[in-house]
């Protein structure tokens, strides 16, 4: 009797379920926008919350960041994995970071491998952020095989810190070896550098005997070699740099700055962008819209240099109601997101500094992000790094009234991720992004809503859209 009842229930459920069949239709291109947040590890600013936490505690904190990033509909996390000549990953070249479990102390797992796996599982990109030349910080211990102990001749004193001499070919080669080692061994989506090349004033006059022009030439050479090396190793890995927000005082006309990045930091970001030595530039436009360093004026200037490569501004959510800018409202960030979209020449994007302000909901920033990011978006493609477009998969779906189960079979292995879209007519949205190795998913009916079509679209490693499988009720 029990078996008969179970069989009846199964047949009843099957009868109620409706099929989604593949049809010979297309779907609009998914929305594109780079939506990233910096997760800083130096000084335990964002993660982990303090050094010495157990592996389980560190993982729990990182998963909370990734889960919240998905909830806010961000699509990339820029994780600092080399704060000062050390590593948040297993390395034969540099010691474990003191910001993890102590100087040179194995934390009991590989944080970068864990971050990559969990980010991809959630449809997020994971960009590895390197501080290229900072070596030691005053009063902070380092591991026994730290570069400052193995090759102290490569270091220069800069105030309370030491840096690898950026003009030294041996120092540059060490940094390149470190970064390319990560590119080869980890499935990262991007390599990211910040604004620290030569030190900021008043510590910029290190005793290297080089003129500002010679320093710039050295940094230019490093940036070019880095880009070439990454693209030769894995063309789909996105290379980005986030320089100081003003190239030089007076650019654009009338803009003032206490720091001359071109002279003091040997940072010629205009040249890197113009020559295509980066896949994107993220100038740190941390000022207000109505300040002397006007956000829109600076955004326009940077975007005009090379319209073929995107400029995505760094936006200072950390300055909401901060000591640096008392009274700055979260609405300022909201307005800057809007401006960055309207002024983008190539593609839109924003990078938020940093996770702490987002995670703590400074000034109610999360509600503003929810208003701007109403559906998921894919990071913009990089057709200059590869033009492969994945073929249409075969797919089918079942709807039992509560959930929709989708399954698909790819034609080849060129899909790095899948964008699941839902819509009718011209009204479509991306409801989730899945890793390339996944071939089925079960979604709540509410996520699809009244959409008459579902599209399962393959996305290549360089972000190119493939032909979707479209399903109809």
In which residue ranges do the predicted regions lie?
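Conserved aromatic anchor
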Residues: 402-414
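Aromatic-lined carbohydrate-recognition surfaces of secreted/lumenal glycan-active proteins
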Residues: 125-137, 192-193, 215-262, 310-320
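Substrate-binding cleft of secreted/luminal carbohydrate-active enzymes
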Residues: 269-270, 274-291, 309-384
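Active-site-adjacent "subsite" loops/lids of carbohydrate-active enzymes
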Residues: 32, 40-60, 117, 127-185, ...
């Amino acid at each position: 009797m029990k078996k008969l009842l179970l069989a009846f229930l199964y047949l009843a459920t099957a009868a109620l379920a409706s099929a989604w069949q593949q049809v010979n239709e297309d779907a609009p291109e998914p929305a594109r926008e780079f939506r990233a947040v910096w997760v800083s590890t130096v000084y335990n600013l964002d993660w982990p919350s303090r050094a010495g936490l157990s592996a389980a505690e560190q993982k729990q904190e990182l998963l909370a960041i990734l889960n919240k990033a998905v909830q806010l509909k961000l699509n990339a996390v820029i994780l600092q994995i080399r704060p000062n000549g050390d590593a948040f990953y297993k390395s034969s070249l540099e010691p474990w970071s003191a910001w993890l479990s102590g100087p040179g102390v194995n934390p009991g797992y590989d944080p970068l491998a864990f971050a990559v796996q969990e980010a991809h599982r959630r449809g997020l990109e994971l960009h590895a952020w390197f501080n290229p030349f900072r070596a030691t910080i005053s009063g902070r211990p380092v591991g026994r095989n730290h570069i400052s102990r193995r090759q102290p001749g490569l270091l220069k004193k800069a105030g309370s810190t030491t840096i690898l001499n950026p003009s030294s070919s041996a120092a540059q080669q060490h940094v390149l070896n470190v970064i390319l080692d990560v590119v080869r061994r980890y499935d990262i989506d991007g390599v990211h550098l910040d604004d620290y090349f030569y030190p900021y004033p008043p510590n910029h006059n290190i005793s290297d005997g080089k003129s500002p022009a010679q320093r710039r030439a050295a940094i230019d050479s490093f940036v070019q070699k880095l880009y070439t090396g990454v693209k030769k190793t894995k063309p789909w890995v996105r290379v980005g740099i986030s320089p100081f927000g003003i190239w030089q005082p007076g650019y654009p006309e009338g803009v003032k700055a206490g720091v001359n990045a071109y002279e003091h930091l040997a940072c010629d970001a205009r040249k890197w962008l113009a020559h295509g030595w980066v896949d994107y530039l993220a100038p740190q436009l941390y000022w207000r819209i109505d300040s002397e360093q006007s956000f829109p004026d600076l955004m326009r200037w940077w975007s005009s240099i090379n319209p073929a490569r995107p400029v995505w501004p760094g936006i200072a959510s950390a300055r909401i109601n901060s000591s640096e800018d008392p009274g700055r409202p979260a609405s300022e960030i909201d307005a800057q997101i809007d401006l960055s979209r309207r002024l983008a020449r190539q593609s839109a994007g924003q990078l938020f500094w940093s996770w702490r302000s987002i995670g703590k909901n400074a000034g109610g920033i999360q509600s503003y992000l929810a208003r701007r990011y109403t559906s998921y978006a894919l990071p913009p493609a990089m057709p200059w790094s590869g033009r492969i477009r994945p073929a249409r998969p075969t797919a089918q779906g079942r709807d039992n009234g509560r959930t929709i189960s989708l399954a698909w079979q790819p034609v080849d292995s060129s899909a790095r991720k899948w964008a699941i879209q839902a819509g009718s007519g011209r009204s479509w949205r991306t409801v989730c992004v899945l890793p390339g190795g996944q071939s089925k998913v079960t979604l709540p009916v509410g996520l699809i809503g009244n959409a008459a079509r579902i599209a399962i679209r393959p996305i290549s490693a360089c972000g190119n859209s493939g032909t979707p499988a479209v399903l109809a009720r």
